[in-house]
Amino acid sequence: MSNKFLEICNILYKNYGSQGWWPVTNKGERLPKYSGGPKTYKQKLEVMFGTVLVQNTTWKNAQTAIIKLNEHDLIDIDKILNIELDELAGTIKPSGYFNQKAIKLKSLCLFLKKFPINVL
């Protein structure tokens, strides 16, 4: 990742801070809700997964897929990389375009293996 990109991200964060407008699932809960943005590693990963799942669908459908990922304890990079593609696709089926999104989630996880969340 280029230093210029990180510099721009840092400037934006310094000036605007965390916006907290994306719903996340709090520990011990089932439904993502607005709570000031992601605070834990798992919540940050959930937001990234959510950005993939919400494409070309409603938030309600994406949220259902996120709930299913949480129920199967799949908000985890290694678990996404190790699960069979068709099983992952079945889990996120409510989000629509589930075969393509399963591939995208695996690609995102490969990227995050190379560039961990704490570096972004």
What are these regions (language model features)?
Residues 1-119:
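N-terminal polyanion-binding entry modules of DNA glycosylases/AP lyases
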